Amino acid sequence: MITRAELAAMVDHTLLKPESTAEQVAELAREAGELGTYSICVSPSRLDVELPEGVKLATVCGFPSGAHPSEVKAVEAADSVAQGADEVDMVINLGLAMDGDWDGVREDIEAVRAACPEPTVLKVIIESAALSDEQIVAACQAAEVAGADFVKTSTGFHPAGGASVEAVRLMAQTVGDRLGVKASGGIRTTEAALAMVEAGATRLGLSGTRSVLEGLDS
């Protein structure tokens, strides 16, 4: 059985509401230190935050629609890294995915990867709830070829929904141990979080982190 500390170390403690205040972001960082999460994930305009020792700083790019031009995403990602972001969670161009233009999807990811090279960690949000199984596989393959470090299920803002165990399992099967898999969007209970890990998630995006962790033994 996974412990509370082990699960916390897999969590991006997340606050991406557009109306988030500086004080709320500061409280998020304090909570991350208290709970022992891997990182905090905040909007690009909220990266000026004091972090507890050991807590990484993650942000988003092209969020939440993914429909921005690649050049705009690249500038946004580079600016976030310049502000101290350790990790960037970018949204794919979902319209290109729906077109079946997987070269276009890959090139969009490559533009962001070029703007934030290693050691910056690049996660690619594919909006799995909006995709068929075949599209999920193709999106994961495009992310891998483009040099991403993780594939991620969801923004949490798409009307199609958030993470599902089935999508996480398929994503994990597609990328194997070559990329990480982040489950995010609608994970509100301990049971849901554990199910995502069991399905193959190696990182979790949670906004209700405390309540999820409290369901586990310390």
Curated annotation (Swiss-Prot):
InterPro entries: Aldolase_TIM, DeoC, DeoC/FbaB/LacD_aldolase, DeoC_typeI. Keywords: Cytoplasm, Lyase, Schiff base. One of its GO terms (biological process) is carbohydrate catabolic process. CDD domains: DeoC (cd00959). The keyword Nucleotide-binding does not apply. Its main location: cytoplasm. One of its GO terms (cellular component) is cytoplasm. It is found in: Cytoplasm. GO terms for molecular function: deoxyribose-phosphate aldolase activity. The active site is at 89 (proton donor/acceptor), 152 (schiff-base intermediate with acetaldehyde), 182 (proton donor/acceptor). Its EC number is 4.1.2.4. Pathway: Carbohydrate degradation; 2-deoxy-D-ribose 1-phosphate degradation; D-glyceraldehyde 3-phosphate and acetaldehyde from 2-deoxy-alpha-D-ribose 1-phosphate: step 2/2. It catalyses: 2-deoxy-D-ribose 5-phosphate = D-glyceraldehyde 3-phosphate + acetaldehyde. Catalyzes a reversible aldol reaction between acetaldehyde and D-glyceraldehyde 3-phosphate to generate 2-deoxy-D-ribose 5-phosphate. Belongs to the DeoC/FbaB aldolase family. DeoC type 1 subfamily. This is Deoxyribose-phosphate aldolase. It comes from Kocuria rhizophila (strain ATCC 9341 / DSM 348 / NBRC 103217 / DC2201). The lineage of its organism: Bacteria, Bacillati, Actinomycetota, Actinomycetes, Micrococcales. The gene is deoC.
